[in-house]
Amino acid sequence: METIQSVITEWSDSKSWDHLFQHNFKDSNWSELFDPVNFKFKFGTTPFSQFQILPSVISLYLVIIFSIKFLMRNRKPFSLKYVSILHNAILCIWSLVMCVGILYEVIKRITAEGPLFTVCETVSGFDKGPAYYWSYIFYISKFYELLDTVIIVLKKKPLIFLHVYHHCIVVWLCWYFMYSGWNLQLWVVFLNTFVHVFMYYFYFQTGRGKTVWWKKYITMIQIIQFICLGIAGLLHSAAINLNSSPCFTHYPAFISAYLINFSFLFLFSQFFVKSYSNKPTSSSSTTTPTKTKKID
């Protein structure tokens, strides 16, 4: 009860929010983008760490996509074939680099100090060093991923709630992970980039007009991803309560992450059931690019 009460107090106390608005984008130290060894997330000076960026970018994103959708209502869709191919190739390669990067750095730390830090980070280790640098690059990538939706509306493809909700909430959540220093972000980055390698490769191939038979398995591994994150959360809770050495945690981030994780699990499962239930086997074995709905 004490923990829940402290979370409610922190969320409701206006003074705890005042410092979020005391930094400007012009204060950014851009050299931090290229220094993984000495990386430390510094609120206000690390590029894109300023809180004001989030409501500004998310609001602009929503205005742009729904304005384009309105303006395109009586127009023919743009092809954007080569733009889509390039965009998805960039995100496939970027996801692969982040996945390999964070896996390499986490394995290095596991070799040196054991695996406990992946669910129980001490105050001296959180939110700094090469592993968390890849988490930061992951956060930066979420801004670029917003172009997914711009391409969708220009091509007049179906725009579903899950897609827009996911893009809006993930930008904020990744920032919150970095801001709070919550160490389960390492799990999030590895699992999500692993899934995205296959997902953006799928979109790259369908953009080229290729048939991809394993479309439905992408949604399945996304669902498995959220289940794995739930298990990681249980291990984190156990480590906090049972481990003799102090684990650093941030309860508002923990609760926010798992409420959002549950919402994703529900929405992706619902999407999977609607998309693949009560369909003939033959229809799920082929994919045409024109009917592909981008959900992530």
From Swiss-Prot:
Compartments reported by the entry: Membrane
Location of the region described as Disordered in the Swiss-Prot/TrEMBL record: 277-296
Main location as per UniProt: membrane
Catalytic activity: a very-long-chain acyl-CoA + malonyl-CoA + H(+) = a very-long-chain 3-oxoacyl-CoA + CO2 + CoA
Annotated EC: 2.3.1.199
Keywords in alphabetical order: Fatty acid biosynthesis, Fatty acid metabolism, Lipid biosynthesis, Lipid metabolism, Membrane, Transferase, Transmembrane, Transmembrane helix
Membrane topology: Multi-pass membrane protein
GO terms for cellular component: endoplasmic reticulum membrane
An MF annotation (GO) of this entry: fatty acid elongase activity
Biased composition (Low complexity): 277-290
Superkingdom of source: Eukaryota
TM region(s), chain numbering: 51-71, 83-103, 134-154, 159-179, 184-204, 220-240, 253-273
Enzyme class name: transferase
Single Gene Ontology BP annotation: very long-chain fatty acid biosynthetic process
The keyword DNA-binding is assigned to this record: no
Family: Belongs to the ELO family.
Role of this protein: Could be implicated in synthesis of very long chain fatty acids.
PANTHER family on file: ELONGATION OF FATTY ACIDS PROTEIN 1-RELATED (PTHR11157:SF134), FATTY ACID ACYL TRANSFERASE-RELATED (PTHR11157)
Protein name: Putative fatty acid elongase DDB_G0272012
Organism, scientific name: Dictyostelium discoideum
Lineage: Eukaryota, Amoebozoa, Evosea, Eumycetozoa, Dictyostelia
